[in-house]
């Protein structure tokens, strides 16, 4: 078990490790993935752990509707890098904890940092509703955002604002902010 998982072993969320087996489980169960990346010295990681991840309502939602993965960025800098890039490209800033919602295939559809308990429940509930109602729409949107990011990275474009504008339109669709 990774250090990060040991640190969170007593909270009620059934955290899994980052592995092919876990990703395959998400695909087989057709469940969205909650990916939470942090590190031991991260103040806001500890705050979110205490205020959000120990809440029974949060745990019930995450355990029943999502595959939840906890990653220590110091043990998996490669994973952190991929999803931090997504956060930076879509929001313009980053930080930890890095919390992402992924499609069952691991493609990111949302990323943020610290969330209060009520914000987290609202966000997860909204994504679960959208995925149940029209999973293909979420897949199409995720693919569009990823293609824009890849295109911009390939051409070294400075047009990050275009991705951010598209992301803001996507967030409006979610009615989260």
Q: Model features per residue range: what roles?
A:
Residues 3-177:
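Replace the tail clause
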